[in-house]
């Protein structure tokens, strides 16, 4: 069947909705008239000015001569003339048929306000490296982490699993053993929850702080960058109600190609032939296990992927009510979402609630709260992807009564039934988060510009995971077991913030911010297990029924105190200076290094404000920025600087019962100190041709010193290792963001956003030892740490093809079809000395993002493509390893004398060198396509609505890659129960949604 026709038949509802939108777009207009004119600035015509009928989507754009023409309803209204860099003008139409306004240049130029941490700044005055995630140009269903894709310097690797946030990095990896995740700040308060706790529809803005100048205000927590999330507030004087809902389905974007029964049989025959054994196709039943032979004879087979798959589905409803009065600003929201993954029993249900309220008690006093509660239900044990790709297509998944087998091929037991654990288990996993901030702001009546704000932010997290494994009636032993895990965390933040803003004459502006803060965290967890239940009716609700019982518990607390000062200064509104210093103290370090100070400074110069630049008509804005500073990373768990004890049993004398005693377990280190990252940043911001082209180029160079690493020590000391500060890691790179306004027409607009990021990560120093005396610092092969190479590089033999029949250089012990590796030292012998760093896979060398936004009348289309280039990862499924058994059923091909592949080994190759098989993870992906329609104002008036938008979104629609797994994005960055060769699919998703406001 024609592929396009098949698509229409499979998703007819999408086509129907598009037809409905087009029909409604033709709703009869009331009687109209035309208004025209010319827009100027001074004596010059102004092309590209937006002309909009206020309160509607009716608009036009001035041509190259500044002329416009717009059709409006007979009753008239108000025209709004706007353009970046100029003050907007509103003109009442009345009976006029011609309106020619004169725009005045916005003196501030870039008046966009950006959240910078402990306050806001006009974008023009920013001196540090801050990037914004443009939520308005993303699909309405997008989650919080996906909004970061395409932000220069930000790397996000998706997992494809419901409820999982994936891996998020800003400008590479800084720490060898500590966390490399960025700090999350929600509404000005450090957020310790999961990003999936936050409803995307509650977010007003997201900023990414990347250099030391912008992150130093967060001191010891900011070495990996900072993401600032600001939630919404009320914007209209009358109450506004908004509803967003969507529903959609997901499917496999790329399914792992497994052996068909025919290919499975052929592989067994080829293996026997290559092994010198009989390989008669008529006797294949003798070469298979009993189960496989019976299924082959009876024509029974399975596709393990089909067995574990479920139809992916997504649905969500968001409701918010907002508004403002003279005394109160409020935003109230609730959301419900239900996501089913592509693998059986892998799901998430989420509900969130938010209340943002600010009240003006007196002209000088405001109080308020930002409170959020989330409830996430992750119950269920997903089917095993790992067992699925190991399962023979001739195996048996279920007995005749429908109960799951323990092993699809019982004779071999090489792979468990991927569905068994899911089907015989009850699982409940709930995660809840209550995050709040109560604040008061006082504007000093005795000194203009002085204000004081106090934040008190208590937050609670409750997690529990309960599991019960029922008796499998097909096994002869008692396999029942149960476990209950309960976790609780309480966290409070108290901040006192003093700000002072002052203007001195015409040329001097400055503001000062001072902070005194405290942070307390306490957490505890309890685990109880039971085994061998004779009664399983109560499941995990009565662990006392188990014959074997165990309990375990843990608790910790951390305290921090912080002091911060920041000064922003502008001279003539073109020279900017920012100085910041923060001092942090933490209980995780001993008394010797409990405190650390992190300073930074930055400068900016708006070159185009200089007199000598005024005659460059094509250049609208040129700004230079430079910054340098230091930030920190605690990077260790509580109590790691102390000498810790543990219990151990010992038998005295010649025997008898053991006694429980206390022994020292780890060696403390009073000199442990903070990891420190020092970063230099250089940037150029530019705008050309009346802001039709705008962008930023940045170069950064950061060094992280005093890395917290556990180092091996001689066992004669009584310990095997000690936590120390050693080594240095460098990250340097280049970032580009470019926005072009390609077409500005009355009925059609087209803009493009392009981003590029390059990061080079390398280890500069480790332990500064030279044990072999070769004059070079020693690497740490055990941890894959190599001087001059990226963190977690791959150290292995270098693949050089496959030995073929007729080759004259086949060494002893090898044969045609075996792997050839390079003799790097040229001694004629392949041994461990021939290993080298073959690549790295955590961070791509290059990232690209390209988004095109097109609008025709009320229709909008957004297309986003992203790419990651320059990284590899092991993909060991290429080698069957044990082809004589039902292990690893990837159909990647294999070497035979009839088909002499140069990149796949023969079936008898046993990989004696234990070489990994590496593949490129490079990809180019059509990540997001969104088509939307904004209904006409006249229809909205009839329905008494403020807004109505219908949209259709397709995500992960196509990927160009050589990666043989399900997806290269999560190919090496995520470790789960499926193993290091992660094969969990990132879904292809189609959504249809509706936004309604009234």
Regions found by a protein language model. Give the residues of each.
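Surface-exposed loop/turn segments flanking beta-strands in extracellular/periplasmic regions
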Residues: 262-300, 387-420, 467-482, 524-551, ...
